[in-house]
Amino acid sequence: METKLPPASTPTSPSSPGLSPVPPPDKVDGFSRRSLRRARPRRSHSSSQFRYQSNQQELTPLPLLKDVPASELHELLSRKLAQCGVMFDFLDCVADLKGKEVKRAALNELVECVGCTRGVLIEPVYPDIIRMISVNIFRTLPPSENPEFDPEEDEPNLEPSWPHLQLVYEFFLRFLESPDFQPSVAKRYVDQKFVLMLLELFDSEDPREREYLKTILHRVYGKFLGLRAYIRKQCNHIFLRFIYELEHFNGVAELLEILGSIINGFALPLKTEHKQFLVRVLIPLHSVKSLSVFHAQLAYCVVQFLEKDATLTEHVIRGLLKYWPKTCTQKEVMFLGEMEEILDVIEPSQFVKIQEPLFKQVARCVSSPHFQVAERALYFWNNEYILSLIEDNCHTVLPAVFGTLYQVSKEHWNQTIVSLIYNVLKTFMEMNGKLFDELTASYKLEKQQEQQKAQERQELWRGLEELRLRRLQGTQGAKEAPVPRPTPQVAASGGQS
């Protein structure tokens, strides 16, 4: 089953910076001081400069494809494809302007031709097409200039050669979507090596490129049945390296979006391979620091699995409880949101298995001093389906959360949270008034016993303190008392001389 992905937008071309001057060797200070300030973000750069062909011949415009007879069409098409395989330096804004314009016009014409003209895609042009695409898009991505790059706050490095690169991606996409496209011919050239290099490009910092790659990889997955297992396997490897080794990969969200539509098309019953992917890859992905960048796509994949096989619910929820964040409130709010999505599709028979540990965690969230965490946890009681599950299992859920709700209603600093807790307690009272009264009496008795124990503990410590003081005073009194001197014994002379 194939999900229609939205086409990428066509943004404007970014400005290309010039090359910074290099100081002569005798002026280089090997012991220059490092500034403690954070460096200003540099503008876009790319590995395109390393692919520039400095000794290339000047490009000249070729005739339009629509102006030549049909007998010469494919020869001219091959010449234009070869022309589009010439690379230019986009870091120099004024270099080879004529050649860049000739290539841009040729790419535009190829895009229109492959999308509108029938009978163009014959077998002999396939190697030329794949060669042109490969030369343009496959390159070594530059290392990130900012090792602490935050996708939510920092501006990404944009690809300077995007005016040409976008047209190449658009041509590739229309090539795959053309009615004349023959997967049986293309599979000789779009092989495992090609797919692996395509997946490596997902680490590009340019979001425009990743958007095109997402759509193209989805089309490749749909067209080439023999590559499907390989694509899934390589995605697994990327995710596992991201979790346990690199902790940085720019295209996680896009790959998860593709996998979401792939999971949606899985046949039932699910294969063991697919279940292992959920347990060993998707669940551990929740432990990554940059979860907020791709959490929406990750949660969608998890929910898709549970809709396919409800028996996986216990593994998923216990896995989420295992990776539940302890110190990051933003991630905690995301976990609560995902948990509500899971509970929206959970089967009542599966809810019984996880209700106690789940609602103990929800109770801990309600008691959080961060009001957004407490508020998000209390919103569970606004969901009608979750509320019906709670009502059916009130004898288990209510004891798990009652003590926390009652205590937080008396102690929380935020009045909104207190009001929400009162509403939840009122709902519980309406669900099962008898159980509510029993828990209230039990809670008050428990508090009285705790107060009594605390009082006894204080009295015990007070008694120990008094005993210590008495012993201290006794020791000091013994030191201050005079020590009696021994009486000397007089030798009896008995009157003898």
UniProtKB/Swiss-Prot annotation:
<dbReference type="GO" id="GO:0000159">
    <property type="term" value="C:protein phosphatase type 2A complex"/>
</dbReference>
<dbReference type="GO" id="GO:0045944">
    <property type="term" value="P:positive regulation of transcription by RNA polymerase II"/>
</dbReference>
<dbReference type="InterPro" id="IPR016024">
    <property type="entry name" value="ARM-type_fold"/>
</dbReference>
<feature type="region of interest" description="Disordered">
    <location>
        <begin position="473"/>
        <end position="497"/>
    </location>
</feature>
<feature type="modified residue" description="Phosphoserine">
    <location>
        <position position="47"/>
    </location>
</feature>
<keyword id="KW-0832">Ubl conjugation</keyword>
<dbReference type="GO" id="GO:0019888">
    <property type="term" value="F:protein phosphatase regulator activity"/>
</dbReference>
<keyword id="KW-0963">Cytoplasm</keyword>
<keyword id="KW-0597">Phosphoprotein</keyword>
<feature type="modified residue" description="Phosphoserine">
    <location>
        <position position="35"/>
    </location>
</feature>
<feature type="modified residue" description="Phosphoserine">
    <location>
        <position position="44"/>
    </location>
</feature>
<comment type="similarity">
    <text>Belongs to the phosphatase 2A regulatory subunit B56 family.</text>
</comment>
<comment type="function">
    <text>As the regulatory component of the serine/threonine-protein phosphatase 2A (PP2A) holoenzyme, modulates substrate specificity, subcellular localization, and responsiveness to phosphorylation. The phosphorylated form mediates the interaction between PP2A and AKT1, leading to AKT1 dephosphorylation.</text>
</comment>
<comment type="subunit">
    <text>Component of the serine/threonine-protein phosphatase 2A complex (PP2A). This complex consists of a common heterodimeric core enzyme, composed of a 36 kDa catalytic subunit (subunit C) and a 65 kDa constant scaffold subunit (PR65 or subunit A), that associates with a variety of regulatory subunits. Proteins that associate with the core dimer include three families of regulatory subunits B (the R2/B/PR55/B55, R3/B''/PR72/PR130/PR59 and R5/B'/B56 families), the 48 kDa variable regulatory subunit, viral proteins, and cell signaling molecules. Interacts with SGO1. Interacts with AKT1.</text>
</comment>
<dbReference type="GO" id="GO:0070317">
    <property type="term" value="P:negative regulation of G0 to G1 transition"/>
</dbReference>
<feature type="modified residue" description="Phosphoserine">
    <location>
        <position position="46"/>
    </location>
</feature>
<protein>
    <recommendedName>
        <fullName>Serine/threonine-protein phosphatase 2A 56 kDa regulatory subunit beta isoform</fullName>
    </recommendedName>
</protein>
<dbReference type="GO" id="GO:0031334">
    <property type="term" value="P:positive regulation of protein-containing complex assembly"/>
</dbReference>
<feature type="modified residue" description="Phosphoserine">
    <location>
        <position position="32"/>
    </location>
</feature>
<dbReference type="GO" id="GO:0071363">
    <property type="term" value="P:cellular response to growth factor stimulus"/>
</dbReference>
<feature type="compositionally biased region" description="Low complexity">
    <location>
        <begin position="1"/>
        <end position="19"/>
    </location>
</feature>
<feature type="region of interest" description="Disordered">
    <location>
        <begin position="1"/>
        <end position="55"/>
    </location>
</feature>
<dbReference type="GO" id="GO:0051388">
    <property type="term" value="P:positive regulation of neurotrophin TRK receptor signaling pathway"/>
</dbReference>
<dbReference type="InterPro" id="IPR002554">
    <property type="entry name" value="PP2A_B56"/>
</dbReference>
<dbReference type="GO" id="GO:0051726">
    <property type="term" value="P:regulation of cell cycle"/>
</dbReference>
<dbReference type="GO" id="GO:0007165">
    <property type="term" value="P:signal transduction"/>
</dbReference>
<feature type="modified residue" description="Phosphoserine">
    <location>
        <position position="48"/>
    </location>
</feature>
<dbReference type="InterPro" id="IPR011989">
    <property type="entry name" value="ARM-like"/>
</dbReference>
<dbReference type="Pfam" id="PF01603">
    <property type="entry name" value="B56"/>
</dbReference>
<feature type="compositionally biased region" description="Basic residues">
    <location>
        <begin position="34"/>
        <end position="45"/>
    </location>
</feature>
<dbReference type="GO" id="GO:0010976">
    <property type="term" value="P:positive regulation of neuron projection development"/>
</dbReference>
<dbReference type="GO" id="GO:0005737">
    <property type="term" value="C:cytoplasm"/>
</dbReference>
